[in-house]
Amino acid sequence: MATVLIVGKSNVGKSTLFNKLIGKKKSIVDNKEGVTRDAVSDRVSYFGKSFKLIDTCGIFERPEDIISERLKNLTLNMLSEGDIIIFVVDGKYGLTSEDYHLADLLRKSNSDVILVVNKSENEKKVFVNFDDFYSLGFGEPLFISAEQGKNIDRLIEEVIKRLEKKGLKLEEEEEKDSIIRVALIGRPNAGKSTLFNGILERERALVTPIPGTTRDAIDELVEINGKKYLFIDTAGLRRKSKVEYKSIDMYSNVRSIKSIELSDVVVFVIDSLEGITHQDQKIAGIAENRGKATVVVFNKIDLVKNFKYRKQEFIEHFMERLYFVSYSPVVFVSAQERYGIGKLIKAIKEAYNSLFYRVQTSAVNAVIQRMIMFSPPPRGLKIYYGAQVDVKPPTFLFFTNGKKVPEFYQNNIRKIIRENIYHFTGAPIFLKFKNRH
């Protein structure tokens, strides 16, 4: 698919432009400098033609810390991916040394660049600096206002014109049901971004030893063995007590939860060195409550001493701490060494298939009647018959005499379905009860 990158220094409005072009709020927008830490991507569709758009991190001329340095390198490495570069500068405050520095890098990369002057609400004021913008060497600039939507259509038309001139195919919208959407979730620094990069076989997400370096939910469409997967690397979910109201971390938490809601399968990444914490239990609960298939991944096994002899220990730890998602397949990986990636993909596909599996009504009732015979329901409760009524997640409806079905007996029903009808590996089973009368 044709790919377009948005680049520029921090705080020139790249994320606002990205959100305007894709037609929804996906990149985090804030007036603090350097808010975007990850390259966020989505599809832009315009009159039946579409291309991939990537919002890159702001580039600093002289990075002040390890994160800024890695951000700069990450963005520079991505320049070769872009068929077109949208170079955004600030029309309100004019050019700075950072703009000239980035322009020099873009010229050296031989990229096809569209110079966009954002924040051009006041045309007369912006036009005073026209010669400065033109001197960057990218031809006549396009003056826009991402905030107000000014000249956005002209920008898209220019992008499409250049892409078509290159002979690139502008794909139609993919059939959504043909793609398995996978969210990588877990606590900060559990290794989600390293795993994300390992699956893609290249660096796409920012990876540093500092917890919480992923702020946006970033995604990538890949094809593995003929099947398309959309992998989403979410920001690590933090405890509410550690997140300030209206802070960037709060927006990241909301975005991560939204990514879970939009996914089919949630890959729950656990740091093997730290084990499963109370916060991990809460994160897994979010996925289960939303009816998502789950795969549990113990990461960093290359750092665990004598792991070969301790695998059962980790499985028992999982069963004890995450008993409510015990139906999930467990995969041991080293994201750093790319060990276990193949097994993970296989587990994801199996969990996805479980979401859509349907069982015969006759099988459900035969098993339930046997259960009632050998393990009768609590006094006063009668269960007459049932059937599977939905998928994604698998949902069963049982007709009763109206008495409440205790949670322990609901768990027994789920267990008997998994053991005697179909395992539904990775998928939660939802139960509904209705008074027959």
UniProtKB/Swiss-Prot annotation:
Residues 357-437 form the KH-like domain. GO terms for molecular function: GTP binding; ribosome binding. GTP 1 binds at residues 8-15, 55-59, 118-121. This is GTPase Der. Belongs to the TRAFAC class TrmE-Era-EngA-EngB-Septin-like GTPase superfamily. EngA (Der) GTPase family. Residues 2-167, 180-356 form the EngA-type G domain. Keywords: GTP-binding, Nucleotide-binding, Repeat, Ribosome biogenesis. Associates with the 50S ribosomal subunit. The keyword Cytoplasm does not apply. GTP 2 binds at residues 186-193, 233-237, 299-302. HAMAP family: GTPase_Der. One of its GO terms (biological process) is ribosome biogenesis. PANTHER family: GTPASE DER. GTPase that plays an essential role in the late steps of ribosome biogenesis.
